């Protein structure tokens, strides 16, 4: 038995002076991992403007355009579905590399596309990369971050999605000045650039300590934990918690061990998730799927993907004005996502989710009402209705970004037990991308069938149902170690009790 192993076998009683803020290393890891989310954000943002020019250049129908806008999210189901098993097989780090590779190839294919089938092939390849990226970034960050800053760091993927969206909007505005048949190809092709930086950045990242423990590499896991914990005691405590969660006895402390009854390769995981889940795992799965469904079904991608169309229907007639207003949406969304990220560990997950969804409901109701009034008064310039429509688009993305945007990824990636986390998180991401694809591929048809105002009133109804679901089903997880979160789920009375306990624990930790 190694001496380092003996040192990790028990938590020593003597407290060690803090060795500087080691969370800076976790911060850097979260930044690098979350860069994968830029690729999805850029695609969402750039397609909102590029679609205007692609439709004219390739002579597409509305149905073809809808499919083109939303199909990437359907294709991403392949990547999301495979990401859980892949990340358990090759590790979280190299799964991030794989995501970047697929999107790099897809972006180049889209940039060089000469017809509709060609560009669809590019979106297929890029979609697989997006699926991998959306699952692995929050899981990796959650597993690296200490409990005290897990919410803040785990919400980074949403920040980078918004940075990507903003970059896409800005790209639209500048490349729109090029000839039509060239501009949209530059808009899409330049999306390959972030993937290159991602591949370089991954070389500086450590592997997830929880994945290393599942492989029996305790020595390597401790080195990562030691770099991301404020004290050596904290690192030892985190390692012991992970070992217990994986099922490794306390007396197994060598740097490399054979994990007893190893199930992390996938055996029994899907059975434990879907066929015979415990009450707590069933509750966790419902919470994960529910929060992902609610995030997308409340209409965020309808606004982000079709902002120019919405502003056109609201009364902004020139393409330049529509794209400028769309850039403003990106700026507001990015600013408020930063605010939400800073608040998630201070006020907790539930408070931000409930506040966010309530604000989204009021914004959607006002937006739907104003667009309905504008539609029913053709030929008239109703400045108050136009102003209300533009303003409520901004308030909708702002309130979304305060809670539903960042907290969804934080919450869904932290609640699963370590053995089920990769596959459980991948199910949530698959549903998220499926709903995003459905919204993207049906919004134009929905706005014709219900009117554009009616479509947003429908989204407002979803927001009400989501608020009730959040209030009823989601316990608070702020400040609770990952290995203890499962105990919060399973029964409502236990949830309420543990919510109070977790809040008290957080206060003690902060003191």
Curated annotation (Swiss-Prot):
This is Putative polyol transporter 2. Its main location: membrane. It is a multi-pass membrane protein. The keyword Chloroplast does not apply. It is found in: Membrane. Keywords: Membrane, Sugar transport, Symport, Transmembrane, Transmembrane helix, Transport. Signal peptide: none annotated. Coiled coil: none annotated. GO terms for molecular function: carbohydrate:proton symporter activity. The chain crosses the membrane at residues 25-45, 63-83, 94-114, 117-137, 156-176, 186-206, 284-304, 324-344, 351-371, 384-404, 424-444, 454-474. InterPro entries: MFS_dom (IPR020846), MFS_sugar_transport-like (IPR005828), MFS_trans_sf (IPR036259), PLT1-6 (IPR044776), STP/PLT_plant (IPR045262), Sugar/inositol_transpt (IPR003663), Sugar_transporter_CS (IPR005829). The keyword RNA-binding does not apply. NCBIfam families: SP. It comes from the Eukaryota. Plasma membrane sugar-proton symporter. PANTHER family: POLYOL TRANSPORTER 2-RELATED (PTHR23500:SF17), SOLUTE CARRIER FAMILY 2, FACILITATED GLUCOSE TRANSPORTER (PTHR23500). Belongs to the major facilitator superfamily. Sugar transporter (TC 2.A.1.1) family. GO terms for cellular component: plasma membrane. The gene is PLT2.
């Amino acid at each position: 038995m190694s001496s380092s192993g003996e040192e990790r076998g028990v938590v020593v009683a003597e407290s060690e002076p803090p060795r500087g803020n080691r969370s800076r290393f976790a911060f850097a890891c979260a930044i690098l991992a979350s860069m994968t989310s830029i690729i999805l954000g850029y695609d969402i943002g750039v397609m909102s403007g590029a679609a205007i020019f692609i439709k004219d250049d390739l002579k597409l129908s509305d149905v073809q355009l809808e499919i083109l806008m939303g199909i990437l999210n359907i294709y991403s189901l392949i990547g999301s579905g495979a990401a859980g098993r892949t990340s358990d097989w090759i590790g979280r780090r190299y799964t991030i590399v794989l995501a970047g590779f697929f999107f790099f190839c897809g972006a180049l294919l889209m940039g060089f596309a000469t017809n509709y089938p060609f560009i669809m092939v590019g979106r297929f390849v890029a979609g697989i990369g997006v699926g991998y990226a959306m699952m692995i970034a929050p899981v990796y960050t959650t597993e690296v971050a200490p409990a005290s800053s897990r919410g803040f760091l785990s919400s980074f993927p949403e920040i980078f999605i918004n940075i990507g969206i903003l970059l896409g909007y800005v790209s639209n505005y500048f490349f729109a000045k090029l000839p039509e048949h060239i501009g949209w190809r530059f808009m899409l092709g330049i999306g390959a650039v972030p993937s290159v930086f991602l591949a370089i950045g991954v070389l500086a990242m450590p592997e997830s300590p929880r994945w290393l423990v599942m492989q029996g590499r305790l020595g390597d896991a401790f080195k990562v934990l030691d770099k991301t914990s404020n004290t050596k005691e904290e690192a030892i405590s985190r390692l012991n918690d992970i070992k217990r969660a994986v099922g490794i006895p306390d007396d197994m402390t060598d740097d490399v061990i054979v994990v007893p009854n190893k199930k992390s390769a996938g055996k029994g995981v899907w059975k434990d998730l879907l066929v015979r889940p415990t009450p707590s795992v069933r509750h966790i799965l419902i919470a994960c799927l529910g929060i992902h469904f609610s995030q997308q079904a409340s209409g965020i991608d309808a606004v982000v993907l079709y902002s120019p169309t919405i502003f056109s229907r609201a009364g902004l007639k020139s393409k330049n004005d529509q794209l400028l207003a769309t850039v403003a949406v990106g700026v507001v969304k990015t600013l408020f996502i930063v605010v939400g990220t800073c608040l998630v560990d201070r006020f907790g997950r539930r408070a931000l989710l409930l506040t966010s969804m309530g604000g989204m409901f009021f914004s959607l109701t006002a937006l739907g009402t104003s667009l309905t009034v504008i539609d029913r008064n053709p030929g008239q310039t109703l400045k108050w209705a136009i102003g209300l429509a533009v303003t409520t688009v901004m308030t909708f993305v702002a309130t979304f970004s305060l809670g539903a945007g960042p907290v969804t990824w934080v919450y869904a990636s932290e609640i699963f037990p370590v053995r089920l986390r990769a596959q459980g998180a991948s199910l949530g991401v698959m549903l998220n991308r499926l709903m995003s694809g459905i919204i993207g591929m049906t919004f134009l048809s929905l706005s014709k069938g219900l009117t554009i105002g009616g479509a947003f009133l429908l989204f407002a109804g979803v927001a009400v149902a989501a608020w009730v679901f959040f209030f009823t089903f989601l316990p608070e997880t702020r400040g609770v170690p990952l290995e203890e979160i499962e105990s919060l789920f399973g029964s409502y009375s236990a949830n309420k009790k543990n919510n109070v306990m977790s809040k008290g624990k957080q206060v003690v930790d902060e003191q």
